[in-house]
Amino acid sequence: WLIPHMKTNVGTISETVIQEAIDTLEENTGSQVNFIVCSSGVKRAYQKALAAYKRNIDVMELQGGYKALSYNGIPVVSDRFCPDGTMYLLNTDDFALHQLCDWKWLEGEDGRVIKQVANKPVYSATLVKYADLVCTRPCGQAMLSGITEA
């Protein structure tokens, strides 16, 4: 159950490729994909594929005023940190932020939070939070790689 669904060497992106991955997740794990993230080149390739079929490109409004492409009501968002030629199909309900504690100020050896920077009329302090984003059901996610970018 720790291994996500992976398809490599996809080539040209299409709605069929995306739907096959979604169907596999639903049939094997009961996971409902609600967020798709990909590289900018993959997003352009997906737009190009939709335009080739003379279809209207569905755009949806996300929280915060952002707009995204849509695949069957699922937002398709590009991210600059996503590897080239890669698309992730995620169920965001399977992710949680786990933290050791809430935000806190680091104290020095003398118990002070605010410290003067040496030889300057400037003070500094450090605010920290030790947390990590954890996926509780990796098998409910999918990765498509080797997609030809536009």
Provide a role label for each language-model segment.
Residues 28:
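Active-site nucleophile-His-acid catalytic modules used for acyl/amide transfer and hydrolysis
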